[in-house]
Amino acid sequence: METSSPALSIAITILIVLLGLTAFGVYTAFGPPNRALDDPWDDHDD
């Protein structure tokens, strides 16, 4: 059984973290938490 290289482990870890942050951002923008977000364009009076 071969052991994986440290570089591969670090690359996979970084990939998982980036995918997690992206998923969290999409969930915050389009999921249930988006009701708490304010739209500055709607708040601006012309």
Curated annotation (Swiss-Prot):
Q: Could you tell me the keywords of this UniProt record?
A: Membrane, Thylakoid, Transmembrane, Transmembrane helix
Where does the chain cross the membrane?
10-30
UniProt feature coiled coil, ranges = none
Topology relative to the membrane = Single-pass membrane protein
- For this UniProt entry, what is the primary localization, expressed as one broad class? membrane
Gene Ontology cellular component annotations, sorted alphabetically: plasma membrane-derived thylakoid membrane
> Which InterPro entries does the UniProt record give?
PSII_PsbN
Answer whether the UniProt record assigns the keyword Transmembrane to this protein: yes
Give the NCBIfam families listed for this entry: PRK13183.1 (NF009650)
User: What family, per the record?
Assistant: Belongs to the PsbN family.
Q: What is this protein called?
A: Protein PsbN
Annotated organism of origin: Prochlorococcus marinus (strain SARG / CCMP1375 / SS120)
